[in-house]
Amino acid sequence: MSEATQTEKKQAQKERKAYRAKKRKLFFKTLFSRKIVLVSAIVVLLIILIAIFADFLMPYNPNQISIPERNQGMSAAHWLGTDEYGRDLFSRVIAGSRVSLIVGLLAVIIACVIGTTLGMIAGYFGGVVDDIINRTSEAVRVIPQIVFAISLCAVFGGGILNLAIVLGISNTTVYIRMMRSQVLSIKERDYIMAGKLQGNSNFRLMFHHILPNSISPIIVTMTQQVGNTILSEAGLSFLGLGISKPTATWGALVNG
């Protein structure tokens, strides 16, 4: 009996490794075949590089006020001109990239953690749990994202962390739907059934077996969502619901 159990365990491990290798291969194939994913990744990478080296790229302090130089046009001294307070717009655009990136990454991480966990629970347990999570997700999804985000901003207020939480919560449904479909396609596979027979807990099966085999679509979704979240942050800042002045953000710069 012990030998049979060991054989089943080894077979289950082989199946897991083979499935993960297949998913990795499919992930890279999908990544390089979808132009929108590549474009999203390149844009995010460019923003990351600008944000990292912002201190070296900014010719002026983005918050430095110079009344004699206000409302100037583009010139050799000020590539994008200056605003009504004489602040260099090129420096503020670069500084805004750092703020937007921080908000975007935090929001995507929050959305991914909450949405992936709820989607995995819904798909794995099914029944009433699935109905509650799925129906709640659908109810949130029918509300326009910007309207939902504005409502949450009224509750949480401004600030980088609060804005990231607001955008993270509003994007949670994307991960719930994606992860639920992944779990439904994985949980009946042989190595999951073998794990149940070996006495593995539901927690271990979900986070040690199902989640690692779903990482590829999660990464693709996160890559796409970073860009979308940055645009949402810009929209909220444009409406005056984002980060308070004088902190430079892209939306606030567009708003003037």
Residue ranges and their predicted role:
Residues 87-102, 106, 126-134, 188, ...:
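Amphipathic cytosolic juxtamembrane alpha-helices at the membrane-cytosol interface
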Residues 26-30, 88-95, 131-141, 152, ...:
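Short amphipathic alpha-helical coupling elements at transmembrane boundaries
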Residues 1-116, 127-128, 142, 146, ...:
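Gly/Trp-centered helix-boundary motif
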Residues 152-155, 182-183, 231-256:
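Glycine-rich helix-loop "coupling/hinge" segments at transmembrane-helix boundaries
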Residues 39-43, 103-107, 133-136, 149, ...:
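Hydrophobic core positions of alpha-helical segments in small-molecule transporters
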Residues 128, 139, 191, 235-237:
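Helical "lid/switch" subdomain of P-loop NTPase nucleotide-binding domains
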Residues 79, 89, 110-115, 120-124, ...:
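Generic hydrophobic transmembrane alpha-helix motif, especially the helices
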